[in-house]
Amino acid sequence: MKDDFDDEEKFVPIDYDSENCPGETAEGRFGPDAILLVGFTPTEKRVVREMLNDMGADFIDLITCTKEMYEKMTLKECMEEKQEGKEVFSVAGMKTKIVIMSGMIGAEVVSVVDAFHESQFKDSAPAFACAVPNSWEKPIKQTVEEISGDHEEAMKDRGSAR
């Protein structure tokens, strides 16, 4: 496993055949079977839930990052939050929608990302990230800001490469 994970290494390739956490940062799966949505509306959350159900991933907990979670919780606490049956509203004012996946191996992550790209989100795809040991105890606010900044930087780089 990668014990020497570099904080500056923002993007790592996902090994489709690996049975480990993406980026090989943990042996096996890391974290609960969950997806944290940041910046999604309740309607969009329902669309994502239907998409996961259609993929046979109805066992994955789908969590919406609320303002309280954003301001007070770590990534770990957010991923362990139970919201069944609650109509929750996401953090307002987010420039970039973010999908943070937990408990998945490479092929599963790729399947989720592909499903988003084939859905109504294809023209405004969110930023995708995976929960890894390096960010597990960080405040979710810090993690979201880092992901959002990295995503904006990557989009600028992609735009200038064309």
Label each residue range with its predicted role.
Residues M1-D6, A154-R162:
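Short acidic DE-rich linear segments
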Residues F30-I35, A92-I98, S124:
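Glycine-rich, often proline-containing surface loops adjacent to acidic residues and nearby aromatics
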Residues Q83-A115:
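Short, solvent-exposed interaction modules
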Residues D54, I60, C65-K86, A115, ...:
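A cross-kingdom feature marking solvent-exposed beta-strand/loop segments within repeated
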Residues K2-E80:
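N-terminal, charge-rich interaction modules
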